[in-house]
Amino acid sequence: MSAPEFTLLFVTVAVGSLFQVSIGFGLGLLAAPVIATLDPSLTPVVVLLLATGVTAAVLALEGGHADVRGAGWALVGRVPGVLGGAALVAVLPARQLAFLVAAVVLTGVAVSLRGFVPRPGRRSVLLAGLISGVMGTATSIGGPPMAMVWQRLSGPKLRSTMSGFFLAGSAMSLATLAATGAVHTDSLRYTALLAPAAAIGVLLARPLSSRLDMRRTRAVAMVLAVASATVLVIQQFL
């Protein structure tokens, strides 16, 4: 990876981490398409490792607001989803996995823009956890289903509940991917190199979150995600 490419990835991870802390998701949505474009072999492990650190930081800051019961049901749904996602990583070639990443990003954005608000009951949370498990393990983008089902929660409760779910869920996904041989030395090396970018995003989010217009912030995240996914698709035909 060239220096300009790494710089682009570093900035993307920092911005994605800022969104992750501010609105509850965004790191995978932004970083996964960029990583898949630059080096598909790093998908989805690097983003999952970085997201684990970011969500742990959010949970440490706002963990007292978490909906533990809701997160628990979501994790029950995530278990079979993780197994399905790991199977996709094992069998899909890099190009098809790149298309899957782009499709997941664009679908997540489309659903968010339609404003669909499901009732966060046990069944819907279980289903969202299942879908998030498949998407998160295969592409590192598991945020949209959970953000959709929990969008009625208050800001701190939304962020802490999603962070608790993603911390445990990412650990499950990483353990399963490691068992299938998807975690390799390059993934760990790039995670270490990008960890400072994630830390910058977390640190910037704290003073900025009270000043951010959440609707505009969410809109910017969606635009950037669509742009990243579009570039990823175009790159597959070059």
Tell me the role of every PLM-derived stretch.
Residues 41-113:
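Membrane helix-loop-helix hairpins that form the core translocation module of multi-pass transporters
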Residues 231-238:
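Juxtamembrane boundary at the C-terminal end of a transmembrane helix
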Residues 6-72, 129, 136, 143-202:
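Small-residue-rich hydrophobic segments that form or flank transmembrane alpha-helices
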Residues 202-227:
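Interfacial loop-to-transmembrane junctions
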